[in-house]
Amino acid sequence: MAIQVLPPQLANQIAAGEVVERPASVIKELVENSLDAGATRVDIDIDKGGSKLIRIRDNGGGIPKAELALALARHATSKVQTLEDLEAILSFGFRGEALASISSVSRLTLTSRTTEQAEAWQAYAEGSEVAIRVMPAAHPVGTTIEVADLFFNTPARRRFLKSDKTEFTHIDEWLKRIALIRSDVHFSLSHNGKPVRQYRCAATDTQYLQRLAQVAGRAFADSAIKVDCQHDGMGLSGYLQSPALSDMVDCHYFYVNGRLIRDRLVNHAVRQAFGELGTFEQPAFVLSLTLDPHQVDVNVHPAKHEVRFHQARYVHDFILQVLQSALSQMQDLPLAEELPRAQESPASVREHTAGYAPYTFNRDAATEAAGVLSSLPDTQRSQRQPEKAASGQRSSVDAGLSQGSSAHRASQTGLGQSGNAATFETSERHGSGYSGAGQGQRYVRDQLSGQQRQAAQYYAELLHTPEVVSTSGSLQAGLPMPPLLAGRYWVLAQDEHLRLLSISDAAKALVVQEILSKLPTGLVGQPLLMPVAVAADADWTMILAERESLLRRLGLELTIRYQQLIIKKVPPYLRDSQLAKLIPEFLEWIKLEVPADEALCHWLAQYVTGFDAAPKVWQRIQSLEATERNKILESARDLPWQTWLDEYKH
């Protein structure tokens, strides 16, 4: 078959296969055109799920008479004129394909009037190559487009349409998405002549929350965390599901420069931010990212659902840091930047691994306390249970005990679900905080200060639990995994003492040993999806030259080009870190000295996130040599039982 140019009608119908999937995609294209025209009100009327009729009316700028017919031609647009315009797109449309594609598979009527015209004009096209007819019409300033009998000339595609109800659901869902980002526009939707949706303009935060409640539900709107941050030419604003809201909300909307997108990078950043709290596999969010249009390519998907960031890693880290900050402030947690950093010197790394002062445990006193508690009336005991505060946040912490992964029968809520516990987890992840005996023990005591009766009962019960692992001075191989406290600590019995072994500390110690074993031969650097660029200091070139062998052993590939430090490869332990801040700090450290291997290992380990589950960590500990196992045991903390019981008695 000879090569030939396709007829315009066939070319338009092929293009319609990408642009016009169903009635919802028609409405998407037409409403976006209305918004590009500056409309502040858009009315949508549909019949039979949009397959019979779609009518879009707006009060935008309108289309001049001379351009009506041209508007229905393929690749005709007013939104881009040059290649430079294509590289900095802020409008929804830019390809000039929508109207031509829609008119090729429907009976389309376009009526419009500009402020300069005394009367309106109407263009009509019926899915054929017949010349477009233009005639006078009555119409206010703005545009109305009617799309009748969608796919009337392509029966095969019409048969693939679902029921009217299903098609309407797709339309309704899309309208929700656009209504959340364009709060300055009044939207209305009618189906078969009956009003269904009406989103009024939202000029204030209160009005926007009303619109948010219409879309995502009242529970989400009332408890949502507001996000608003501007930094270095980028801005992130919107609302985030509160950890206090346990219900799953089907609301996952992310916008880039006003355009709704689906992006795995964004979803990963949101999940990672909530992962620090140990909650939500898929939290709800409505977030809008604004950045220089030159830094994002929107011309990568036929339906414009995806974008490509020129600095993907930087965008990811910006989103992650803003969300972590919002969650921390909401729960009154210390931010990562406020915590002491262990990489400042090898001494601080050693300080972080220091042990804790021992305490004695009075078995008789604990048993006596348990007896006193058991004699309390049920009503008094029930009043000790944690309650939810009116704000939706947890007002107390319930120290739950579990064997393996099963929750202790006396507790339903562990420390991992409370705001203060998240503080502890965040501190540990950044290798800081609670690094001394007084701080670590004071943290546990403060969490239980309001529930000492219940805590004493829990621990007294532990004394009669045969499954508590007895270490007898050393951690033997082959022992079963000990009980869990609040999902974060193992409870060990040593002589007459009960000790808490932090699972995250143990996991971090395993990471340190893993890195220490690999460091002599060198770590394997992983290339970044997008290299990170940082403004370089004058002496960094000298540092890279003098410490070249050290950087190679760590798997770091750094170059300086045009007065910028380009980060190309990093060891896997740093992949989830803020490299633009971390690497410059590291260069300042190694400029002064060549750190010891152990200090380097602790520095890398503190940035590892997503540790293994407790059973796997315990299994790895059991596989170690006795000396290494005992090192981990030494990091366990004695419980100050005598102090707590004395406070209880008084």
Swiss-Prot record:
Functional description taken from the UniProt entry: This protein is involved in the repair of mismatches in DNA. It is required for dam-dependent methyl-directed DNA mismatch repair. May act as a 'molecular matchmaker', a protein that promotes the formation of a stable complex between two or more DNA-binding proteins in an ATP-dependent manner without itself being part of a final effector complex.
Keyword Transport tagged: no
Keyword DNA damage: yes
Gene: mutL
Region Disordered, residue ranges: 374-420
Compositional bias per record (Polar residues), positions renumbered to this chain: 392-420
Stated name of the protein: DNA mismatch repair protein MutL
Superkingdom, taxonomy of origin: Bacteria
Organism classification: Bacteria, Pseudomonadati, Pseudomonadota, Gammaproteobacteria, Alteromonadales
Keywords from the UniProt entry: DNA damage, DNA repair
Family to which this protein belongs: Belongs to the DNA mismatch repair MutL/HexB family.
GO CC, alphabetical: mismatch repair complex
GO-annotated biological processes: mismatch repair
A GO molecular function held by the record: ATP-dependent DNA damage sensor activity
CDD domains: HATPase_MutL-MLH-PMS-like, MutL_Trans_MutL
SUPFAM superfamilies: ATPase domain of HSP90 chaperone/DNA topoisomerase II/histidine kinase (SSF55874), DNA mismatch repair protein MutL (SSF118116), Ribosomal protein S5 domain 2-like (SSF54211)
